[in-house]
Amino acid sequence: FLPPCAYKGTC
C-alpha cells in the first residue's frame, strides 16, 4: 500500500 502522494508522484 502506497500513500496518496505516491499515486500522483508529489511526495
Curated annotation (Swiss-Prot):
TM annotation in the entry: none
Keyword Secreted: yes
Keyword Secreted annotated: yes
GO annotations of cellular component type: extracellular region
Keywords, ordered alphabetically: Amphibian defense peptide, Disulfide bond, Secreted
Disulphide linkage map: C5-C11
Biological processes per GO annotation: defense response; positive regulation of leukocyte proliferation
Tissue: Expressed by the skin glands.
Compartment(s): Secreted
Role this protein plays: Induces mouse splenocyte proliferation through binding to CCK-BR.
Protein name: Riparin-1.2
Species of origin: Crinia riparia (Streambank froglet)
